[in-house]
Structure formats: structure tokens, C-alpha cells
Amino acid sequence: MSAKKSASKATVTVQQIGSPLRREPSQRQTLIGLGLNKMRRTKTLEDTPAVRGMINKVAHLVRVVDEA
């Protein structure tokens, strides 16, 4: 039997709280990959292991606002 995936996917909302100035280029690219490029911007993303890894990499620059 095949298992059906639920229609609603888990999401996570992140807000940028730190500046990418004077940071490593890889951290800047990670912020861009998350869709964050300016202070206080928020973005709702699909909660996947890849996104969680990106959030962990720049945890000092972002804040998790909501997990749904």
C-alpha cells in the first residue's frame, strides 16, 4: 500500500535580526538562500532538513518566529 502525504506541509517563519556586514561570504549566501537580505525581514519557508540546516548555520543572524 502506498502512504499518502498530507496536503498541508509544515512551515517555519524566520526573521533576520543580524546584519550580514563583516560576515563570511558563505553566511551572506545562506541568508540570500533563505530569502532574507535586509534587517527585520520575515520569510515563511517549508520546514525541511535543508532549510533547518541553513537556519542553524546563521542562527546568530536569524530568529525563528513561528513553527507551524
Swiss-Prot record:
Residues 1-26 are annotated as: Disordered. Keywords: Ribonucleoprotein, Ribosomal protein. Gene3D superfamilies: Ribosomal protein L30, ferredoxin-like fold domain. Signal peptide: none annotated. GO terms for biological process: translation. GO terms for molecular function: structural constituent of ribosome. Belongs to the universal ribosomal protein uL30 family. Part of the 50S ribosomal subunit. Coiled coil: none annotated. Residues 8-18 have a biased composition (Polar residues). Disulfide bonds: none annotated. This is Large ribosomal subunit protein uL30. GO terms for cellular component: cytosolic large ribosomal subunit.
